């Protein structure tokens, strides 16, 4: 599943092609995504795209009439292509531009979304209760200490809770906890301020590095140019259960936590 870095890489890739472009058409070949593509999504036609933003794992295409909300789901991708490019399997939506290009949404598993919002997007049900962005100043040790106070839930599950902090999915939660030396099953409310300071710094550093590397491609993800991300080459624990720790040589353990694969080093991340 594309996480925050992959969505941000996509935003950066499509932005130069969309900004200040007039939308000349919206072709929906298959409206059966995670939620049906609404008829009101056509209201973007004739509008000029004023901004391309990311909130959590959602992409927001702003116009004067409203905002298109796009989610890549489990396997979705967005590419900028000439309008004449032949349609391939799973190419569900084309946003047609005055430049002669299209923003093409491909989603084999159809867990993605293409929605329309006329309200201030912060009031949309999908966005209203989201936590802070991890790369912004609002995500800091003071905030995290307060958010985790008294929580008995495993810290990894808290990192992946979008009400606490957005966009830190399974890949980067595993990596940040390893870098901070924190066992993923540690009760969140029992982590002292010193270790939380390290954790916040590692979350920010790892996400920023992943964006710089073009995201992590494990199976489906490609950027707006159809190229994979290369951060997978820098993964220390995710997907490496049973292999040796890059720091100490101990065998990495793998468990299920919240139904997600969780990999850690029992020596570098003592419980």
From Swiss-Prot:
Cofactor list: Zn(2+)
Cited InterPro entries: DNA_glyclase/AP_lyase_DNA-bd (IPR015886), DNA_glyclase_Znf_dom_DNA_BS (IPR015887), Formamido-pyr_DNA_Glyclase (IPR020629), FPG_cat (IPR012319), MutM-like_N-ter (IPR035937), Ribosomal_uS13-like_H2TH (IPR010979), Znf_DNA_glyclase/AP_lyase (IPR000214), Znf_FPG/IleRS (IPR010663)
Catalytic activity entry: Hydrolysis of DNA containing ring-opened 7-methylguanine residues, releasing 2,6-diamino-4-hydroxy-5-(N-methyl)formamidopyrimidine; 2'-deoxyribonucleotide-(2'-deoxyribose 5'-phosphate)-2'-deoxyribonucleotide-DNA = a 3'-end 2'-deoxyribonucleotide-(2,3-dehydro-2,3-deoxyribose 5'-phosphate)-DNA + a 5'-end 5'-phospho-2'-deoxyribonucleoside-DNA + H(+)
CDD domains reported for this sequence: EcFpg-like_N
Keywords (A to Z) from UniProt: DNA damage, DNA repair, DNA-binding, Glycosidase, Hydrolase, Lyase, Metal-binding, Multifunctional enzyme, Zinc, Zinc-finger
EC number: 3.2.2.23, 4.2.99.18
Single GO term (MF): zinc ion binding
Residue spans, zinc finger FPG-type: 236-270
Residues annotated as binding DNA: 90, 109, 151
Cofactor annotation comment: Binds 1 zinc ion per subunit.
Gene3D superfamilies, per database record: 1.10.8.50, MutM-like, N-terminal
Pfam family, one: zf-FPG_IleRS
GO BP: base-excision repair
Record: active site: 2-3, 57, 260
Stored NCBIfam families: fpg, PRK01103.1
Function field: Involved in base excision repair of DNA damaged by oxidation or by mutagenic agents. Acts as a DNA glycosylase that recognizes and removes damaged bases. Has a preference for oxidized purines, such as 7,8-dihydro-8-oxoguanine (8-oxoG). Has AP (apurinic/apyrimidinic) lyase activity and introduces nicks in the DNA strand. Cleaves the DNA backbone by beta-delta elimination to generate a single-strand break at the site of the removed base with both 3'- and 5'-phosphates.
Subunit structure: Monomer.
Similarity section: Belongs to the FPG family.
Name of this chain's protein: Formamidopyrimidine-DNA glycosylase
Protein species of origin: Shewanella loihica (strain ATCC BAA-1088 / PV-4)
């Amino acid at each position: 599943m594309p996480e925050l870095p992959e969505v941000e890489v996509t935003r950066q890739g499509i932005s130069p092609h969309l900004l200040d472009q007039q939308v000349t058409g919206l072709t929906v070949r298959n409206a059966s995504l995670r939620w049906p593509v609404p008829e009101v999504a056509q209201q973007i036609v004739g509008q000029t795209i004023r901004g391309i933003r990311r909130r959590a794992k959602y992409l927001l295409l702003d116009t004067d009439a409203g905002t298109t909300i796009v989610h890549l789901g489990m396997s979705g991708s967005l590419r900028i292509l000439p309008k004449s490019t032949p349609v391939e399997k799973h190419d569900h939506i084309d946003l047609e531009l005055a430049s002669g290009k299209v923003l093409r949404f491909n989603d084999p598993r159809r867990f993605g979304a293409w929605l329309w919002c006329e309200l201030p997007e912060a009031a949309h049900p999908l966005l209203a209760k989201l936590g802070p962005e991890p790369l912004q100043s609002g995500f800091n040790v003071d905030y995290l200490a307060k958010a985790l106070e008294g929580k008995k839930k495993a810290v990894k599950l808290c990192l992946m809770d979008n009400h606490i902090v957005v966009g830190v999915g399974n890949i980067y939660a595993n990596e940040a906890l390893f870098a901070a030396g924190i066992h993923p099953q540690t009760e969140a409310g029992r982590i002292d301020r010193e270790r939380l300071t390290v954790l916040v710094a590692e979350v920010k550093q790892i996400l920023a590095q992943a964006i710089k590397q073009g995201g992590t491609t494990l199976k489906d993800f490609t950027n707006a140019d159809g190229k994979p991300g290369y951060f997978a080459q820098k993964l220390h624990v995710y997907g490496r259960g049973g292999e040796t720790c890059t720091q100490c040589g101990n065998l990495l353990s793998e468990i299920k936590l919240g139904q997600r694969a969780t990999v850690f080093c029992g020596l570098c991340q003592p419980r």
